[in-house]
Amino acid sequence: MSQKLKVVTIGGGSSYTPELLEGFIKRYHELPVSELWLVDVEGGKPKLDIIFDLCQRMIDNAGVPMKLYKTLDRREALKDADFVTTQLRVGQLPARELDERIPLSHGYLGQETNGAGGLFKGLRTIPVIFDIVKDVEELCPNAWVINFTNPAGMVTEAVYRHTGFKRFIGVCNIPIGMKMFIRDVLMLKDSDDLSIDLFGLNHMVFIKDVLINGKSRFAELLDGVASGQLKASSVKNIFDLPFSEGLIRSLNLLPCSYLLYYFKQKEMLAIEMGEYYKGGARAQVVQKVEKQLFELYKNPELKVKPKELEQRGGAYYSDAACEVINAIYNDKQAEHYVNIPHHGQIDNIPADWAVEMTCKLGRDGATPHPRITHFDDKVMGLIHTIKGFEIAASNAALSGEFNDVLLALNLSPLVHSDRDAELLAREMILAHEKWLPNFADCIAELKKAH
């Protein structure tokens, strides 16, 4: 790493950026970021300007010697960067609303990282991430790209499957939330060493063991969650329903809250349909929260991250991002839960898959934790199904072909009819036209047929 530490945040006008900056300020003594560049696109400029002003006030208030820059020119920012964080949303929140509302209008779950909605977020995002990777390879080839952009698993799979770039790590806040839940319910002290055996795919992870100071307390934790005495960890954008005792005991694993979309599909769909018919979707809630946040951010007296940001649903985002960068920069060999290719360490899945699992993180990036060599056979059917969906989705994002989109939709367990898959594909490709430039030929054909 260079003497100066330059971090570039793509999607710098995001409402999450103050949390990221707060994380850098808190860790400045061991992670001395000298330059932070905030990059956005023309459509995000008004938000970028507000975020930049707030971040400058936060830096001045903290008294750290960090230089802050803003630009719409990604290439200008990337030159000689050490770390690049990606937190972009192609099409911004209006595109997310389409991802949620169109599937719901056909009677299917509408969610930005699963099913039809997750597919179309991936189709919009993957080509943009590939463009960023190309720029990184040219302008800062030794930089690490730390990706927070959803769907993180699909994006990581696409980068490793279709590019030669190897310094890419997909990060999610869900495992951090699970870790904080465990610390809380087991009443651990800061000095207690907590190690978690976590495995699966992004937004489809399971915990199979929890070690406190080297001793397993998983049975106690599982029993508490199964019996309902311990309330399992959830996130802001998912309705809080408990998994049944029978499911938890039969799995003998702790599933993350996103698995509600698979194990409680009927209940989750009923709740979402109820919200939809009342005229609401999660994207609309988020847009209201965002509007309020940016009004707060404009206040020239505000010099710290406001507490209201926690309503946005990105809890522990800062800890996840900053600690990953910290572990690499300082060669900490610390335990993290990230998306990477496992390179054959897991003996019962293909060697080239990107997975989300417990890893050791240091100067050379992330390596799978030596303790985890086998994914639990009980959930391998579901994992294989979703990985097939991710691979098909990443292929479709590159090809721009209607039939590749159709294949991905038909492989998703959240789409139950081949006829509906075709209707969804047509409607969603046309709805997202301006954000799917590599589907231009496909869109022209669809319009002609229409």
Swiss-Prot record:
Keywords, sorted A to Z: Carbohydrate metabolism, Cobalt, Glycosidase, Hydrolase, Manganese, Metal-binding, NAD, Nickel
Pfam families named in the record: Glyco_hydro_4, Glyco_hydro_4C
Keyword RNA-binding: no
Catalytic reactions on record: 6-phospho-beta-D-glucosyl-(1->4)-D-glucose + H2O = D-glucose 6-phosphate + D-glucose
Residues the record lists as binding Mn(2+): C172, H203
Induction: By N,N'-diacetylchitobiose.
Free-text cofactor note: Divalent metal ion. Manganese, cobalt and nickel ions enhance activity whereas magnesium, calcium, strontium and zinc ions do not.
Binding site for NAD(+): 5-73
Site (Increases basicity of active site Tyr): E112
List of catalytic residues: Y258 (proton acceptor)
Binding site residues for substrate: R96, N150
InterPro entries: GlycHydrolase_4_CS, Glyco_hydro_4, Glyco_hydro_4_C, Lactate_DH/Glyco_Ohase_4_C, NAD(P)-bd_dom_sf
Cofactor(s) the record lists: NAD(+); Mn(2+); Co(2+); Ni(2+)
GO BP term (any one): diacetylchitobiose catabolic process
EC numbers on record: 3.2.1.86
Molecular functions (GO terms): 6-phospho-beta-glucosidase activity; identical protein binding; metal ion binding; oxidoreductase activity, acting on the CH-OH group of donors, NAD or NADP as acceptor
Source domain of life: Bacteria
Keyword Zinc-finger in record: no
A single Gene Ontology CC term: cytosol
Signal peptide interval: none
Record family assignment: Belongs to the glycosyl hydrolase 4 family.
PANTHER family reported in the protein's UniProt record: 6-PHOSPHO-BETA-GLUCOSIDASE (PTHR32092:SF5), 6-PHOSPHO-BETA-GLUCOSIDASE-RELATED (PTHR32092)
Subunit structure: Homotetramer.
Protein role: Hydrolyzes a wide variety of P-beta-glucosides including cellobiose-6P, salicin-6P, arbutin-6P, gentiobiose-6P, methyl-beta-glucoside-6P and p-nitrophenyl-beta-D-glucopyranoside-6P. Is also able to hydrolyze phospho-N,N'-diacetylchitobiose.
UniProt name for this protein: 6-phospho-beta-glucosidase
Gene: chbF
